[in-house]
Amino acid sequence: MKRNPTLTERFRILLLPLFLGLLLGFGVLLAQDAALQLTEKVIVSAEKKYGPGARVRLLAWTKMIADNRKKPEAEKLKLANDFFNQIPWVSDIENWGVEDYWATPVEMLASNGGDCEDYAIGKYFTLLALGFPMDRLRINYVLAPAQDPVNQAHMVLTYYPKPDAVPFVLDNLVKEIKPASARPDLVPVYSFNGEGLWMAKERASGRASNSSSKISLWAQLNERMGKEL
């Protein structure tokens, strides 16, 4: 009798190509040009589609980044975490009409809604723009059965003060920034940034998984972000 794949195995089968696609593109762009600026054309377009609140949110985002690049790291972490956590949670079906859509930070802020991956991605790019080294940031797919027993998949951002340190978790569900050691409710599966992809068991060794795969979801996101900046 054929065994049904476990949830973790389904993560590996369905999401691994997506993670690998994230190793390319916009993360490198932001790391090289951290002075984030949005054109008036992008802001006007968002305002026409989503109303005047879109302009307010986008300008608040760029101002927050511009005003705080020289602040201490702990303060910048809290600023980015709090800024995106104030955006309402909205499912991809409700917001975009599809089951899985990775919104750009501009799209999330303009539409005033997003789900777990949008929070993590928005914080990641914001911290890059605030001057954080890419190698200290990881976007993490985790299982969070205590938060949602039915759909356990969740995404958070982690920050490593030092390469071998216990990371801090930036989450939209538990909004206080805590060390990962204080978040036993999260079961790590994968982590990635613009430089590599790590399975949970590989993180301690510092070894990145190797692949050059790309998929359309990230390619489309990268294309949209290129038009926004």
Give the role of each language-model region.
Residues 1-9:
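N-terminal secretory signal peptides that target proteins for export/translocation
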Residues 11-13, 124:
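Hydrophobic alpha-helical segments, especially transmembrane helices
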Residues 14-25:
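Bacterial N-terminal signal peptides
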Residues 26-229:
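A structural boundary/capping signal
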